[in-house]
Amino acid sequence: MSQNKSKSEKLQSFAAPKGVPDYAPPKSAAFLAVRDAFVNQAHKAGFEHIELPIFEDTGLFARGVGESTDVVSKEMYTFADRGERSVTLRPEGTAGVMRAVIEHSLDRGQLPVKLNYAGPFFRYERPQAGRYRQLQQVGVEAIGVDDPALDAEIIALADRSYRSLGLQDFRLELTSLGDRHCRPEYRQKLQDFLFALPLDEETRKRAEINPLRVLDDKRPEVQEMTADAPLMLDHLDAECREHFETVTGLLDDMGVPYVINPRMVRGLDYYTKTCFEFVHDGLGAQSGIGGGGRYDGLMAQLGGQDLSGIGYGLGVDRTMLALEAEGVTVGAERRVDVYGVPLGKDAKKALAGIVNTLRAAGISTDMSYGDRGLKGAMKGADRSNALYTLVLGEQELENNTIAVKDMRAHEQHDVALDEVVAFLQGKLI
């Protein structure tokens, strides 16, 4: 009876919210490998890290990302804080970076300002493979120089970031979205085309606010209706066309392969001129693994100088899926250099001091806890993949020695307690 009662009173456990993935070991090793590879490539290219708030004033994204986008109109996590201020969990990184550049006057120094960031972003989407409500990204932004060579550098950096992981079966899609000089005429032509179609009310409203958004509609019936829509790439003015041709020429010179996709429309309103996306067909419908573009009017739109900028965001989650699709393994299995096995209370006290000294010396060290006995503790040593295992029992304490087991060579050395740190340093450092 008491057993049944205890079962009924058992507290309910919890699961992660829908669409929010955990990366527990061993998968966390792959997560760190992908994220760190992206960050390291950015640092090698002269980008400095910036740490951004997880939430911002809602107006920043409404004005910066664009109210006609699905991101702002449907996907943002927005709430009122205790001071009744409207704040939003960041759905993307560029607007926050631009806000920080303006706020801290980073644009008053040497240009371009080159910044990189990494972390979680939040969008209320329908969860499926590769589409999460908390997504992990690494991004870069280069602000203050209107130079197509910078566009090419950014694109090549993203390409190199993927290849540094061993990813191969992806493609770079590229286009130009024009600028404030040539886009208005194209916008009118596109609206004239769209308003002649039997669009539903929501799509028609989108065409009124930003007709490019309609070309980004993934519904088959809308894609079929817009198959013959006029394209921005055919309506570039001379300056934008020269800019785009310079970018593609530089990519050719750098050996970065690409395909031109004149129908590409990124999901954010601030893009101008160069726009690009990296696609991996092994992911099915959610094939985009990263992308970016130029945003020449964004800083002024957010209250700063009228400076140009270009950047990208690389999806860590989707890149992990792409690597899995190609059968590429990244992330070394967790391993410590040394694993300590104490046998008895006195041994545990002595070994704790040795473990602490080894860690201070830069040697990664773990230790067996609980009274598991030699057999159980050695199983822990095997699971740790340690290179060396230290066994300290009563006999070793009496002899003032410790057994050092070489787990690869299957050899054992009896070493004086006061010499074991130096002995292991000689083997490992």
From Swiss-Prot:
User: Keyword Ligase: yes or no?
Assistant: yes
Keywords assigned: Aminoacyl-tRNA synthetase, ATP-binding, Cytoplasm, Ligase, Nucleotide-binding, Protein biosynthesis
Entry's localization field: Cytoplasm
Which CDD domains did the record assign?
A: HisRS-like_core (cd00773), HisRS_anticodon (cd00859)
Q: Which reaction does it catalyse?
A: tRNA(His) + L-histidine + ATP = L-histidyl-tRNA(His) + AMP + diphosphate + H(+)
Q: What are its E.C. numbers? A: 6.1.1.21
Which top EC class applies here?
Answer: ligase
Please give an example of a GO cellular component term from this record.
cytoplasm
Q: Which InterPro entries match?
A: aa-tRNA-synth_II (IPR006195), aa-tRNA-synth_II/BPL/LPL (IPR045864), Anticodon-bd (IPR004154), Anticodon-bd_dom_sf (IPR036621), His-tRNA-ligase (IPR015807), HisRS-like_core (IPR041715), HisRS/HisZ (IPR004516), HisRS_anticodon (IPR033656)
Which is one GO molecular function term here? histidine-tRNA ligase activity
Q: Name one GO biological process term.
A: histidyl-tRNA aminoacylation
Does the record bear Glycoprotein in its keywords? Answer: no
Q: How does it assemble?
A: Homodimer.
Question: Which family is annotated?
Answer: Belongs to the class-II aminoacyl-tRNA synthetase family.
Which HAMAP family does the record cross-reference, listed alphabetically?
His_tRNA_synth
Return the protein name: Histidine--tRNA ligase
Organism encoding this protein: Corynebacterium glutamicum (strain ATCC 13032 / DSM 20300 / JCM 1318 / BCRC 11384 / CCUG 27702 / LMG 3730 / NBRC 12168 / NCIMB 10025 / NRRL B-2784 / 534)
Taxonomy-wise, where does this protein's organism fall, top ranks first?
Bacteria, Bacillati, Actinomycetota, Actinomycetes, Mycobacteriales
Q: Which gene encodes it?
A: hisS
